[in-house]
């Protein structure tokens, strides 16, 4: 099914230009596919055609990302509008999204190129305020912009007031993001097939404040009244903070587009949780 394969690497990461990566490119070429890479990449190989960004998105049927989850997030931001399926090969650390292992690449890629794969569509979250429009795969984080200092805000869902409170900030996480920053902040793990968001206060002043789950079709709004600095901050998927003036209302919604992730047919989310989070199959090992 896939005859024209694009590859994507973390920019300026010379550490990925190693024997393992070169061997995977050679294995890919043996599958009788055309291999392309965007000219903005620093990686070069005789078996890979270097093309412009416009040629890249026009030619490729699938993008294979070599790296960790952060690299896959970067590729999603660059190519989301073209709706090209993405396959992740884990050359990073945890790697919930990059589920192909380097030592299993040859077997996995042959199966996928023969049609033994499934495509999973992951929801994306958008945040709008003033003239800004941000989007991400993992989460929207709105915070005070100062370490261990609170801001006061009011939260709305579908035009109804949920609460007004003080906290370091608020995380709105997708199921994909539930195994990322939101997990570190005490949020629940959400199966990626569920169409929900997690709303998670960051170090709230009220001890009764807890994370809660809502439909991803809900309209979430947040109005910030005051904080320790001249502005509050918003950050999406760990990108650079953007200033939010006090009194501004931020609208958080599900995007119409989805990210299409390619997995082997035997991909198992719970196996990934066991492996990445150290869960045990034997209670005596816990």
Task: Place the predicted regions along the sequence by residue.
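Redox-cofactor binding/interface segments in oxidoreductases and associated redox assembly factors
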Residues: 7, 65, 172
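Short glycine/serine/threonine-rich phosphate/pyrophosphate-binding segments
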Residues: 17, 71-75, 179-184
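Gly/Ser-rich helix-loop-strand patches that form or flank binding pockets
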Residues: 79-89, 96
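ATP/nucleoside-binding phosphotransfer catalytic cores, i.e., glycine-rich phosphate-binding loops
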Residues: 134, 142, 147, 158-161, ...
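ATP/NTP phosphate-donor binding region
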Residues: 1-62, 102-118, 129-134
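Short glycine-rich anion-binding loops that position phosphate/pyrophosphate groups of nucleotides
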Residues: 69-71, 94, 176-178
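Gly/Ser/Thr-rich active-site loops/lids in small-molecule metabolic enzymes
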Residues: 164-167, 172-208
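Catalytic core of DAGKc-family lipid kinases
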Residues: 16, 94-168
């Amino acid at each position: 099914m896939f005859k024209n394969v694009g590859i994507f690497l973390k920019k300026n990461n010379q550490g990925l230009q190693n024997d393992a990566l070169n061997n995977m490119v050679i294995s890919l070429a043996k599958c009788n596919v055309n291999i392309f890479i965007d000219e903005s990449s620093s990686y070069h190989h005789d078996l890979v055609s270097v093309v412009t960004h416009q040629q890249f998105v026009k030619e490729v049927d699938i993008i294979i990302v070599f790296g960790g989850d952060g690299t896959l997030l970067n590729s999603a931001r660059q190519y989301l509008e073209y709706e090209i399926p993405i396959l992740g090969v884990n050359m990073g650390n945890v790697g919930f999204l990059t589920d192909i292992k380097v030592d299993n690449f040859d077997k996995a890629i042959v199966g996928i190129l023969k049609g033994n794969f499934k495509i999973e569509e992951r929801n994306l979250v958008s945040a709008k305020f003033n003239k800004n429009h941000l989007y991400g795969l993992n989460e929207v984080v709105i915070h005070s912009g100062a370490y261990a200092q609170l801001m006061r805000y009011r939260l709305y869902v579908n035009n109804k007031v949920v609460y007004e409170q003080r906290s370091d900030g608020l995380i709105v996480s997708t199921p994909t993001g539930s195994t990322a920053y939101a997990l570190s902040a005490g949020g629940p793990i959400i199966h990626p097939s569920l169409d929900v968001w997690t709303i998670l206060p960051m170090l709230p002043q009220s001890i009764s404040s807890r994370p809660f789950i809502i439909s991803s079709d809900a309209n979430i709004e947040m109005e910030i009244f005051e904080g320790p600095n001249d502005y509050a901050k918003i950050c999406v998927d760990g990108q650079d903070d953007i200033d939010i003036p006090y009194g501004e209302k931020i609208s958080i919604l599900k995007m119409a587009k989805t990210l299409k992730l390619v997995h082997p047919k035997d991909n198992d989310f719970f196996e990934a949780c066991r492996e990445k989070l150290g869960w045990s199959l034997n209670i005596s090992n816990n």
